[in-house]
Amino acid sequence: MMDRVRAVALGNSPADILLKNGRVVDVLTETIYEADVAIAEGVIAGVGSYDKAEKIIDLKGAYVVPGLINAHCHVESSMAVPEHYCAEELRWGVTTLITDPHEIANVAGAAGIHYMLEAGGQMPLNYYVNLPSCVPATRFEHSGCVMDARDMIKLVNEPGVLGMGEMMNVPGVIYNSAEVQKKLDLFQSLGRVIDGHAPCVRGKELAAYVASGIDTDHESISWEEAKEKLRNGLAVLVREGSASRNLTAILRGVIDEGVDVSSLAFCTDDKHLADIRREGTIRHCVQMAIELGMEPVRALRLATINDARIYGLRRVGAVAPGWQADLVVFDNLQSLTPQAVFHKGVDALKACEKITPVTPNASLQGSVKPAAFSADTFALSHFADDREYPVITMLPGEIFTEKSTIMGKDIASALEKGDVHLIAVLERHHGTGNVGLGLLRGYGLKDGAVATTVAHDSHNLIVIGTSPEAMNVAAKELVRVQGGYTLVKGTEVVDTLPLNICGLMSSAPAEELIGSLDEIAAKAHAQGVLDGIDPFISLSFMALPVIPKLRITDMGMFDTEKFEFIK
């Protein structure tokens, strides 16, 4: 193979594909120059003046850019299967992605990770998995699986496994949890990258966290936080997703202070499928950076070579001889609309059309198994008249919540007025019968219920409603379809979106899935869900007991400031 690549490089043999008359974006020297790109055997054989090839494509001055890299994402957050998610990424020029499948791991453990590896691994892009490090995320809820260091040892050498996923257990790292240290030791001994997750961790605690072997962080929300992490030796992944949008705040500081960008890269973390379809992922980050005043070639560094170097990906991320022929052709560097996308010298978009999605095994399609329940499970009789109860107060446009209270004797009238709603989390993995029951305000639903099996991070069944009867209907509908979203009016099901894989993802085509998501959300808003509240996504975060101030899990109402359950 290399003999032929050398012959093409020397001009003695025709290339497989010749990209003629292009402008090469060189992220190694931050320059742009006119050249042809000769591709042979899946790699770039030469960049310069070439004439011979099996296929010649005249670019007419278009820009040849290294394939873009998404340094950190969660495929499951799109609710699309890996094949359909990857196809959307490729449409916008991403040829390498690094995913942390901790959502499906919390439901199905190693079986879920194997599915993600198989499904994504057949796609025409570089698809890497960082093994989830925190399954479950906390001890305050029941997940479908528990993964310790011994489980990770069994997976670490699987094809496609790159490093360790985000280490969310910051106290466990800083204060030397034995189990956390075993995980860190495993990946450090193999020379693998360890992703961090350190929101608002500063000072000496940050130093201890980084000194333990953490390599990256994607949780900075300000330039000052990002700068401190850079000074402590972390690679900072600049996040621009659907809910968490931190790029502008960080890059304004980078541009204003003129700092070196070698340890900066772009990622999305969580991004909705409709947003990806509309604007892409990393391409959107590059466009935003350029609009903020960053030079286009420098912005593209944060989307290509920087990511590759941070994660140790050899010969990926630049347009140079001997490097993998992962390339994107753009007409211009303003609109950044891909004209062609190549992976290992193959037209990646055409290659996508030939791929059939993997059929998940039966265990991944039958994961909603709560113990028996009825309307009585959600009844007002669980609340005593003479007691004060905490109420989760939702905030429009935020996943943070506030705390309020209500006397038990006032709950029935508040429900009738729509001032509060009932909320419950049913353990759905092992049939334990655990049910957390509580109260919530600020959602706005009228006469019915909403339920979902997407409930971060353990993904139990969460339901909110105006009556126990409506909640019972909604929860039973999700058991019937084995996971997804559902909306009930009165006690009749209005609409259901099945998420047939672990209650997290749909095997429906992307366009169909986007339409279904938009439709059920619109119906929920028409039924009273307030503006600024996503009927399902906002609800899914009410079960995550690591975000202030008040949450609910299958074990009960949880005060995240005191880090304890409310008895």
PLM regions and their residue ranges:
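Active-site microenvironment of metallo-dependent hydrolases
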Residues: 1-35, 39-40, 49-50, 90-92, ...
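Divalent-metal coordination cores built from histidine and acidic residues
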Residues: 5-8, 83-194, 257-259, 494-498
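Residue-level marker for buried hydrophobic side chains located in beta-strands
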Residues: 18, 67-69, 129, 266, ...
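Short, small-residue-enriched loops and turns at beta-alpha junctions
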Residues: 76-77, 104-107, 135-142, 170-174, ...
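Histidine/acidic residue-rich metal-binding segments in metalloenzymes
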Residues: 112, 146-166, 172-238, 245-266, ...
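Divalent metal-coordination and catalytic microenvironments
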Residues: 22, 42, 61, 72, ...
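Short, ordered loop/turn segments at secondary-structure junctions
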Residues: 101-104, 132-133, 169, 199-200, ...
